[in-house]
């Protein structure tokens, strides 16, 4: 083929390589991206991590631009049409050495997760090397990725003129087709090539509680996002084993009906918890505290937006993960990778995870780290599962859903599960900076309630509602200096004084209990993303916890009915309030919707509201 003149993009999806050519433009906001009006018209948007600034979220501003390739021509080519050559990186090393990275991991475990700032966080480091001819090197690496990497979502090379990106991303961030929005949370890592792993090793990986909970946490986080995108929330499908050349992951698909514009969806879903953490907006703050530089496009998205033959908007937007960034100006090659840190993470285990994640890209540049696996298609694209079709592996995957909430396995329209005592009753949800409240809103609407959801700092009055939900959120509930905790205590005080029917969840529960005079403490081990069986008011329930702090059970019950989790409160009931330390809306709470229904009926019946 003729020598390509940038800008252009080569994208391999579905065993075909698409060559897109056009012009590149730079934009300030996602809403500034041009609308694709005609069937067959397309644009390829490159959304940097710093785009968070347009939503007011925390990040290092490194100036990486929001760009779009306005597609003017498209053709399909084969691997044989690509230039041949050798990809080689020289003087390559991670910018943060292994020991330093392990110390950074420990700092996040001790300073953030243990202090209630979140359940999981992704800490990045970057492999940096140099090459002589960036364009030739990029093409050689692209060709190698097509042959070597298996089961990638996109394998691509994008040349904007002053920057080159080549990678094999495993993960769809979000897609849109016929009004259905799909996300694809991937987490949990088998840190070796599937082709060299034994069945016992794969089954041990699938039964590892750390790996299992890691995936459940990102499923919860993406369910939050899709509850913002569609009123009926998301529906989960999976889990599946996703096998790459040098490692394997577990994954779900989550789908939601939506009427949102593609650009609005991109804005609402910045960015995937698999590249950031949870709760998402506090994860951005934690990343800014612990990473010393901007992320460029790492953790951002590439979004191919167009229209189908019926005029419906379409979008295919993978995460920018497992990508090498080549700078023609200085010959540098950068491969950023991150590990997901959760309670129980081993710092050096997370070091090994970053090596495994970088390996798939680095092998394409001649940095040999281990064998590949899989057969190849007619295009030379590696494919074919090694373990995904094994009966024991499939059974192990299916068994994971036995512990999860069936609520999120099907759509529930507003009022579909209506309870007479709840129909038409009004509820205010106070959002304490955790979008679990968006999942709560979906559940409450399905029960027939009329829902208003507000950030804590936008609530002017709690009057005029039949019920108030004091929601979850990150942070130390004992902090007298934190404005959010001050506001949350004030809400709890007013709700108790007015005898307003109240459901308080996690942080809201802790703040309400503090106003009731109960003692809070920091747990010796965080319960972030843990499922625990607890006796709850006469029933044994599997409950999903995301807490680093808890309320100690009082010696005397007083006016309360208590549910204990050892020395701590799992829940308490008062005459006009219920406090729940766990998350009934979480996929980890097996019968969360039934628990919500019982408590809401009790509250609204007892008070005559």
What is each residue range found by the language model?
Residues 489-495, 501-505, 509-598:
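Pocket-forming structural segment of enzyme catalytic cores
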Residues 73-92, 130, 190, 197-288, ...:
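Contiguous alpha-helical scaffold segments within structured protein domains
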Residues 12-137, 211-213, 231, 237-242, ...:
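Non-catalytic accessory segments adjacent to catalytic cores
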Residues 419-427:
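A short, charged/proline- and glycine-enriched loop
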Residues 384-419, 586-609:
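Acyltransferase
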Residues 426-427, 434-504, 516, 604:
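Flexible gly/pro-rich beta->alpha loop and the following alpha-helix that scaffold active-site loops
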Residues 255-388:
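Conserved hydrophobic core element of enzyme catalytic domains
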Residues 4-15, 122-213, 305-335:
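An anion-binding catalytic pocket shared by soluble metabolic enzymes
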